[in-house]
Every structure is written in C-alpha cells, then in structure tokens.
C-alpha cells in the first residue's frame, strides 16, 4: 500500500534560501518545457527528459539541481496536461496550461535516489543531494517495512517548509468482510455535519473565531502598500490565518472519517457533487466551509485502508423518500422532521435520509437479496424493506403524496419494524 507522511522541516536561513532558489529554478524549467510543448508537436515526457543533459550545458544553474528533480519537473508538466485532457473528455470546459509566475510553483520532488534519513547526532535530519542535511521534526516514525519512493519538499504560503514522504509497504489492505455485521448510512449537512443510522449526530465545526481573525487580518492587509515590507509581513499573517482554518478543519475531518472507517464494516454515503452544490445560489459559504468533498475522499481511502466496504449512492430523493414505505413527499428545508403522509412514519429529517442512504448502499454493493449469515440488525433492516418496490407511490392513499394528511387517511400502514428501529435510534 502507498501512504504519504508529512513532516515539518527546520532549515537554517542559508538552507531556506537555497531551497527557495531550487524551487524557483524548477519553476523556470517548467516554463521552459511548457513553451516547447506549445510550439512542438508529438512530444512526450520521456522524449523531453532526454533533452535535460544537453540543456545543462547551456544552462549552468541546472547543474546545481539533482537530475531526478529535473526529470520530475518535466513529468509534472505532462501529468498536468493529462489531467487537463481527462477533464475535457469528461465534458468540462478547460483552458490551457498556464505559465507559472513566482509564488505559483512551491515544491520539488526527489524520486528513487538523492535522499536519505539520518540520525547520527541524536536528531533526525534529511539529507538531500545538492542541498545537504536539513533538520526535521520527526514527530512520528515511518513503518518499519516502508520503502521511501519519493520525497517532496514544499514551502507553504506562510513561509514554512515541509517534506512529504511517499512510502510503499508490502502488505495488502485487509480483506473486506463478506457479510458485514455493522453497517451505517451517513447523511451530511451544515448544522449537523453527520447524522447516521445509529442516531449519532455530530455538530458542525465552529470556525467563527478563526474566520473573524482572518477577516481582520485581510482588512489590515488591504491598508498596506502593495509590495512593501509591511505588506509582505501582513500577507504572511493572512496566510497563517488561512492555515489555522485549514488545520482545524482537516483535523476534524480526519478524526471523524477515521472513526467511521474503523468502527463499521460497511459505510454508505451520498455521492455528492460538492463543486456543483457550492455554485448554487444562497448559503454557498457554509457549503464550501463544510468541505463535504474532502470528508468523503478521506472516508473512502480510509475505508479501503481498514478493509471497510464504502459505497456512494445517488443522493436524489433521499430526504423526500420515506424510509418506511418509500413514498416521496416534498418538505421545505426548514422542516426538520419527517412525517410520512402515507404510513404515518415520523423521524428526524436527517435520520430518515441516513436510512435511505443505507438502504440504497446495501442494494448497490451487496445486492437486493439477503444472505443467510447476515447480522440480526441487517436482517431487521431487510424485513422492513423487502416489501418495498422501486416505485415511489403507496398501495393506496386518500390524497396525493404532496398533501399533508393524517396517517389514518391512509390504507397502507408501512412497515413497523423499521419504524421502531429508527425511532429508537433517534431517541438515543
């Protein structure tokens, strides 16, 4: 399996200047080969990498940069081009690769060779070819059987330097259980970040203080003369405020996704178009700050790492559809309780959505039929849902499903098993 481990570098002022020079040289190499790409047909990363030795004869600065680093710069350009083509094939509107200005290119990568971890003087240091030894805050050990494949050195907008080790371990991820015992459906939101089928609701992270400090720092920056020493000092303060927000949010998402990946055997979530949701009018700031896409990506790779089934289902109608009988009924966003006009089933709005997500996830990944050896909890769930058809209408209703009616007006009573299970989960 492949993992990334990130550590803080503590270079001296001289080393930090040399690292910055290396980054800027790599930026110029990137722009050089981008210029060639725009003027030359039928080029590839391999053919362009073969030009580096001759380029060093005319460009003396390149002799101070490790050969593998320069090769990765060219590879990075063509990886970006491949990503751009892939998005275009998927129907996205794309432009062209852009020339990198100073400050827009912040990292360089060693691969296969040119680096080594040392601990001869009681403190761990990273040795990099052409650069020397750099002290590192080695706050956690790498796995004993891990092999370092790549070393990426990156400068954050705050001016801090970090190193990311790309390591490979020989073991395969654990096998996913054939008959999962603990299954959970997760509905994400803004006020309650997650609400699952076990009745667990996690409140969204409060970032109001961090946002207030960021806005105050941005106002101070707007009053500085652009490019002055005071402007640069305040720019770093703004970058630090952004970093505070990012770290607090990522810490919250890492802990939450780690909990679900390790606690359950089967996790079902909505396949959300996070970018499309942010572009919708109204409440875009809260949607962007929720970082649902980041949470789902974290949850997916951690489920793969821990041997947990992960399935993303179509989110359409999960809130409107009744988890008991399958009838769809419109409800405004401010209505936080689900009350079915067909069967009378009542539950928290998010709990009802979570059960629908779990139902769709089980059908998508494990099939619509039931296994003889599934857990009693899942047996109860299937008992509650086995009579449901794919249609969204009940057997018989007195009024249309869009009309708010009393449950006694409805002939079909739904399934009491799921009603009892969900009601008990919500009350916990």
Task: Write out the residue ranges for each language-model feature.
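Gly/serine-rich nucleotide phosphate-binding loop at the start of the catalytic core
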Residues: 1-72
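Positively charged, low-complexity nucleic-acid-binding target-recognition regions
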Residues: 2, 286, 290-428
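Gly/Thr-rich phosphate-binding beta-strand-loop-beta motif of the actin/hexokinase/Hsp70
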Residues: 11, 179-197, 350
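Acidic carboxylate diad motif detector
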Residues: 50-156
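A short acidic-Thr-Gly-centered motif at the start of a beta-strand
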Residues: 160-184, 338
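Phosphate-interacting basic helix/loop segments used at nucleotide- and nucleic-acid interfaces
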Residues: 163-170, 240-263
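Metal-dependent catalytic core segments for phosphate chemistry
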Residues: 192-233
